């Protein structure tokens, strides 16, 4: 009996050790990676401002270190400022217009008291400019409990002005809690080696771009990265641009990771990675998700960096504490939120294609959506837009001659509409990936452009057979009145026929939820009448930003729908990317009246979020789920929300405070006030009944698209006749 007991204890011990080993960090110390806030929360407030440093304490924990780019004034006072020149990052040019170049050594500490800080990155909020003064290093030290990281970028510059950066740093390290001192200059680090206690303050060699030359050795930083044993003689760690670890090619795709972290750890060097910011362009592999990028440096199964230098410290802080070491297959869902795709995973693949749906299902979407369009031969299929120009390469084909203006749909621009082509013609087109507005400068995965194929509604209804994790499907029906009145096509009947056929074929679709969504009450009423659909299966979509919903409108909606879709701006109204108030009460009002509330559209790109969410799509999701308590998220990046549902610290951190950033703004820089969004009234919901389709459209009344299609070929025919005539003459 003793032997089995011993074996059992051995197995238990082995299991515990194996679990501990597998869950330990692959950092040099075995502890979680550190987070260093570069100039405070410099992604939001001006770098090195008191607001930037204070926001770090509000959004993270005392463990997060504050970074100070140390500069010296003419009278030797140490200040925190991101650049040698004061021009970029302050309003010094308005204070003293006489200097061509303005450095901190040109001013005494007292003279700098009138200089205010400004945002140095043009894409970031400028409304906080000219509010905060430059801080002395002693003032910054009072704001942190964990200690400071001092960066000395150019000690030789100050030596030319008879100022000793070394002496200043030594003095500061004796008076203040300085955890790390970094510099790209080897001579400076060597001079500091015997002046600080390595158990208290660590010296870190900062790498610049690989082609740049380090002055002491006259070697490139790229070559020095291959001589880590030499680096170990004067430092205890390295700070490298992230591309040293995960290279990115010219097309913005990741290359295989290097062995730098592993090699450095073998030499006893810590590795800190830099150049992280939520509003920087990152490799397409990350789908514009900053948390995914951080996780690739710490949770890849091969190595982990020892820390991050970030302009948005809340994101790496939560990536480390909430999303690392989470097994997506085994982890339980913490957040109760339904994920509905927006044209599939249309952030990664062309929308409404087989590949977009496949990615959405594998990424964790609960419900796949199909925006139903109709072909000329009355076949319903899935496509994100009524206009083929928006979703396909039709403009590159001979079908471009079918361009027409349909005033009922878009009176300002011509289009090539789905009802102008047969299904077989549409299937010859290549799908194109949807991008944000052109002026954003952000493009979605170009390698996936023109990948995949569009699905007919019949094929779409079979997807639950392929992806067993799905809870249901959502079918969106728009432009039904136009199609009936002008094209003689009943999209409602076409959808009902496909639903009946799918049920008859017993393809298991009937066992899953089918939702019908529309912006038109008349469409939803028609489904309710013809198919006896329960109002819980009908979803009413509000296609405008609204600030309130009248009680009479809610009562009307409840008669024909059980769910409602509203925009993000209807919940958190914002202008110039700054939320104007904490939140409206729309969601709670709708929910208290028994309606499920879905919100659209959630994307990963930083330009789609209000600044109050710190350019972090995960923090935005958290606010809508925990604060507003919506029922579902409609997203073109389902993976981001699916990962959020399984985070380890759900509910442990405080909610992101919305509507308060504006109180820190410079009133002179705020945009002018605008009229609030309108309220949704009963008159906005009420519509005349949807007419029945004609049996056949009148032969004498071709559509405008057909007129255009006939007109262009006729011109070619006429030209051919004339050519033949002149040849014969």
UniProtKB/Swiss-Prot annotation:
EC number in record: 3.1.4.46
Tissue occurrence: Expressed in stems, flowers and siliques.
Localisation per UniProt entry: Membrane
Glycosylation sites: 88, 162, 218, 227, 285, 302, 390, 401, 507
Transmembrane segments: 709-729
Pfam families: GDPD
Any GO BP annotation: glycerol metabolic process
EC main group: hydrolase
Chief location: membrane
Domain of life of the native organism: Eukaryota
Cellular compartments per GO CC: membrane
Membrane-topology annotation of the record: Single-pass membrane protein
Signal peptide positions (record): 1-22
Keyword annotations: Glycerol metabolism, Glycoprotein, Hydrolase, Membrane, Signal, Transmembrane, Transmembrane helix
Catalysed reactions, as listed in the record: a sn-glycero-3-phosphodiester + H2O = an alcohol + sn-glycerol 3-phosphate + H(+)
Gene3D superfamilies membership: Phosphatidylinositol (PI) phosphodiesterase
PANTHER family xrefs: GLYCEROPHOSPHODIESTER PHOSPHODIESTERASE GDPDL5 (PTHR43620:SF10), GLYCEROPHOSPHORYL DIESTER PHOSPHODIESTERASE (PTHR43620)
Protein name as it appears in the record: Glycerophosphodiester phosphodiesterase GDPDL5
Gene name of the encoded protein: GDPDL5
């Amino acid at each position: 009996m003793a032997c089995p007991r011993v074996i059992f204890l051995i197995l238990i011990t082995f299991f515990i050790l194996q679990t501990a080993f597998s869950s330990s960090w692959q950092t040099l110390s075995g502890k979680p990676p550190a987070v260093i806030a570069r100039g405070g929360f410099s992604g939001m407030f001006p770098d090195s401002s008191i607001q930037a440093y204070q926001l770090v304490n509000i959004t993270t924990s005392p463990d997060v270190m504050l970074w100070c780019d140390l500069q010296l004034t003419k009278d030797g006072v140490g200040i925190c400022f991101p650049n040698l020149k004061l021009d970029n990052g302050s309003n010094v040019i308005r204070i003293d217009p006489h200097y061509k170049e303005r450095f901190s050594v040109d001013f005494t500490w007292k003279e700098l008291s009138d200089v205010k800080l400004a945002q140095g990155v043009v894409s970031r909020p400028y409304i906080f400019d000219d509010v905060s003064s430059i801080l002395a290093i002693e003032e910054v030290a009072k704001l942190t409990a964990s200690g400071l990281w001092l960066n000395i970028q150019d000690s030789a510059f100050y030596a030319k002005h008879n100022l000793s950066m070394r002496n200043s740093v030594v003095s500061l390290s004796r008076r203040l809690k300085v955890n790390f001192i970094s510099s790209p200059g080897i001579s400076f680090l060597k001079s500091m080696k015997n002046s600080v206690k390595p158990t208290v303050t660590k010296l870190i060699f900062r790498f610049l771009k690989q082609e740049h030359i380090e002055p002491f050795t006259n070697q490139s930083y790229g070559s020095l990265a291959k001589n880590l044993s030499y680096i170990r003689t004067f430092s205890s760690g390295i700070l490298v641009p992230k591309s040293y670890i995960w290279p990115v090619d010219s097309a913005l795709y990741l290359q295989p990771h290097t062995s730098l972290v592993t090699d450095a750890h073998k030499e006893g060097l810590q590795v800190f990675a830099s150049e992280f910011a939520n509003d920087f362009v990152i490799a397409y592999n990350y789908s514009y998700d900053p948390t995914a990028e951080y996780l690739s440096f710490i949770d890849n199964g091969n190595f982990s960096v020892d820390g991050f230098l970030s302009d948005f410290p809340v994101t790496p802080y939560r990536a480390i504490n909430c999303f690392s070491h989470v097994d997506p297959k085994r982890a339980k869902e913490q957040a109760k939120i339904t994920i509905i795709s927006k044209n599939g995973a249309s952030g990664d693949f062309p929308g409404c294609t087989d590949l977009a749906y496949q990615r959405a299902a594998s990424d964790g979407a609960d419900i796949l959506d199909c925006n139903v369009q109709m072909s000329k031969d009355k076949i319903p299929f899935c496509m994100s837009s009524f206009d083929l120009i928006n979703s396909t390469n039709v403009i590159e084909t001979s079908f471009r001659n079918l361009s027409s203006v349909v005033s009922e749909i878009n009176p300002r621009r011509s289009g090539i509409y789905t009802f102008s082509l047969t299904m077989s013609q549409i299937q010859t087109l290549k799908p194109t990936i949807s991008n944000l507005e052109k002026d954003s400068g952000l493009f979605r995965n170009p390698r996936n452009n023109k990948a995949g194929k569009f699905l007919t509604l019949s094929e779409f209804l079979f997807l639950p057979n392929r992806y067993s994790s799905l809870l249901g499907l959502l079918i969106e029906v728009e432009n039904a009145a136009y199609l009936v009145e002008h094209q003689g096509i009943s999209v409602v009947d076409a959808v009902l026929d496909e639903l009946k056929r799918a049920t008859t074929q017993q393809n298991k679709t009937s066992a899953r939820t089918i939702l019908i969504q529309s912006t038109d009450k008349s469409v939803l009423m028609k489904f309710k009448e013809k198919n006896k659909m329960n109002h819980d299966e009908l979803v009413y979509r509000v296609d405008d930003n609204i600030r309130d919903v009248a009680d009479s409108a809610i009562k009307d909606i409840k008669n024909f729908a059980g769910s409602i879709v509203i925009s993000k701006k209807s919940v958190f109204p914002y202008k110039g990317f700054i939320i104007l108030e904490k939140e409206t009460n729309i969601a709670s009002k709708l929910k208290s009246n028994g309606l499920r509330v879905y919100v659209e559209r959630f994307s990963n790109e930083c330009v789609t979020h209000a600044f109050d969410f710190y350019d972090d799509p995960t923090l935005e999701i958290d606010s809508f789920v925990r604060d507003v308590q919506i029922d579902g998220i409609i997203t073109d990046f389902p993976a981001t929300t699916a990962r959020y549902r399984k985070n380890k610290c759900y509910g442990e951190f405080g909610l992101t405070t919305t509507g308060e950033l504006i109180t820190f703004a410079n009133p002179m820089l705020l945009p002018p006030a605008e009229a609030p969004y309108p309220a949704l009234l009963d008159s906005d919901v009420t519509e005349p009944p949807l007419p029945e389709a004609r049996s056949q459209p009148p032969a004498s009344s071709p559509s405008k698209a057909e007129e255009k299609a006939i007109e262009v070929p006729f011109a070619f025919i006429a030209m051919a006749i004339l050519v033949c005539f002149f040849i014969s003459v």
